Amino acid sequence: MAKVKVRIPATTANMGPGFDTLGMALKLYNEIEVEEINGKTQIYNNGLKSEEDFGNNLIYKSIIETMNKGGYSYKGFKINVVKCDVPISRGLGSSSACIVGGIKIANEIMGNKLELKDMIDLATKIEGHPDNVVPAMVGGMVVSLKTGEDIKYSKIDLPKQLKFVAMIPSFQVNTALSRKVLPKSYLKEECIFNISRCAMLVSALYNGEFDKLRTCFQDKIHQPYRKNLIKNSDDIFKKAVEFGSIGEFISGSGSTLMAVLNKNEDEFVISIKRYLSGLQDKWNVILLEPDLEGVRIVKI
């Protein structure tokens, strides 16, 4: 019976003006190991058996969808999440990691019946939008769009000196609620505001024009409404500027806040940790680099 292990990166999506469009893989990982078995599917977390109904498990659902698409006959699986460093419901692509991991594992078991494009299309169908699943699949920073059921994407070369500081609070932000707070329509001026900044963000990153990044990360589509779901977000962003950040944004739908740096990363981390320690909620601070590879098979 086949046994496969994968490593999947965390992702940060939206990145300011690129709502449901921009995303980037980060060097923070989950690892999933799956073995085909003849009996009933079993779920484990780091070797400890879970009481979770496997039918509701996103990894299992993604495996089944992939195998059904590939016409592969299966019985059951032993699914073991051996590493889970991507925090759940914090805007760092935890659901995308499950989906992409499940699809990659299933395709490997099937003998790679599906092409990369097929896997991306399927992952987007399961997730509902491409901005997390595409970078989780291919790595790097990615612009993604949907045309019907077809997904198109383009990778962006990032300057090597850029680092990203994830400020992760102890509280979650529900994705459904974070979409519910958004307005049903926008003014033309607000749309132009975002289109111009999203376009310039891609150009500024490509050209290494770091002085433009803070303006480019501005947004009027989602962050003004979602920041109220993240306690102290305005004050934290102000402190990030004070401590040397060159750009800030809400990661995905939150609750993680992201700061962008091109120098003095260690000093920034020390300063922001000291500030966050004085707030009511607990915050975890992680210095991250982009992951350029995406999901990968790991030797067992």
Swiss-Prot record:
Pathway: Amino-acid biosynthesis; L-threonine biosynthesis; L-threonine from L-aspartate: step 4/5. GO terms for biological process: threonine biosynthetic process. This is Homoserine kinase. One of its GO terms (cellular component) is cytoplasm. Its main location: cytoplasm. Belongs to the GHMP kinase family. Homoserine kinase subfamily. The lineage of its organism: Bacteria, Bacillati, Bacillota, Clostridia, Eubacteriales. The keyword ATP-binding applies. SUPFAM superfamilies: GHMP Kinase, C-terminal domain, Ribosomal protein S5 domain 2-like. It comes from Clostridium kluyveri (strain ATCC 8527 / DSM 555 / NBRC 12016 / NCIMB 10680 / K1).
